[in-house]
From Swiss-Prot:
The keyword Lipid biosynthesis does not apply. Belongs to the HisA/HisF family. Its EC number is 4.3.2.10. This is Imidazole glycerol phosphate synthase subunit HisF. One of its GO terms (cellular component) is cytoplasm. Pathway: Amino-acid biosynthesis; L-histidine biosynthesis; L-histidine from 5-phospho-alpha-D-ribose 1-diphosphate: step 5/9. Gene3D superfamilies: Aldolase class I. It comes from Proteus mirabilis (strain HI4320). IGPS catalyzes the conversion of PRFAR and glutamine to IGP, AICAR and glutamate. The HisF subunit catalyzes the cyclization activity that produces IGP and AICAR from PRFAR using the ammonia provided by the HisH subunit. The active site is at D11, D130. The gene is hisF. NCBIfam families: hisF (TIGR00735).
Length: 257
């Protein structure tokens, strides 16, 4: 059995790491490179960087910091933000990123997933899915351009349908960003994770809602996710990654220590 992964998420805007609540009201956390170094030293298995306004601004992720991160950390990292072409992805990979992640551009052009997988291999291609639970309909729905409050929009896709679609097109990994839970630290949406897990054959990462160590344990034990992504609990030093891994290991979860 593969070790479960602990993945700090760094939302990037204007060259700094920021964090919001339910994708709104972002506060500045700090500089990108020192935070990346800190998490690598604390025992993170990998890092994910989201340039949160790149897609809504119509630009690709700022590459200047990607190469700096590659120089200072020795763990894998994934970069997302406005990647609309095979060439965009190639540049980011050439600057040292191990994976690229696409979200809104994949919704605009689903063939991008297969083109990226064909060129760089499925192991490099992560698809992020911003999913919102609609209480009126009881459905999980996919949203697009969530980095910009003015442009955020619901798509025609239901989450479970889109999860299956991206796998068929060559996604090597799926990150499920549960918008209702984002930043509120009340726990991952275990019901949604379990539903998605049933239709997911590739590695699946939970994102949105971690507030205490037990939330990670629940995601691994009850929803069988492959990795758990979190931001504010690490940024605000509510949870130490080494201590989290010790806790998980003591509770029967295989992790790298």
């Amino acid at each position: 059995m593969l070790a479960k992964r602990i993945i700090p998420c760094l939302d990037v805007r204007d060259g700094q790491v920021v964090k919001g609540v339910q994708f709104r009201n972002h506060e500045i956390i700090g500089d990108i490179v020192p935070l990346a170094e800190r998490y690598a030293k604390e025992g993170a298995d990998e890092l994910v960087f989201y340039d949160i306004t790149a897609s809504s601004d119509g630009r690709v992720v700022d590459k200047s910091w990607v190469s700096r991160v590659a120089e200072v950390i020795d763990i894998p990292f994934c970069v997302a933000g406005g990647i609309r072409s095979v060439e965009d992805a190639g540049k980011i990979l050439s600057f040292g990123a191990d994976k690229i992640s696409i979200n809104s551009p994949a919704l605009s052009d689903p063939t991008l997933i297969s083109r990226l997988a064909d060129r760089y291999g499925v192991q490099c291609v992560v698809v992020g899915i911003d999913t919102w639970f609609d209480e009126k309909t009881g459905e999980y729905l996919v949203y697009q351009f969530t980095g910009d409050e003015k442009r955020t929009q619901q798509t025609p896709w239901k989450t479970l349908d889109w999860v299956q679609e991206v796998q068929q097109r060559g996604a090597g990994e799926i990150v499920l960003n549960m918008m209702n839970q984002d930043g509120v630290r009340q726990g991952y949406d275990l019901k949604q994770l379990a539903l998605v897990r049933q239709v997911t054959q590739v590695p699946m990462i939970a994102s949105g809602g971690a507030g205490e160590m037990s939330h990670f344990l629940d995601a691994f034990k009850l929803a069988n996710v492959d990795g758990a992504l979190a931001a504010s609990v690490f940024h605000k030093q509510i949870i130490n990654i080494n201590e989290l891994k010790q806790y998980l290991a003591e509770n029967g979860v295989k992790v790298r220590i």
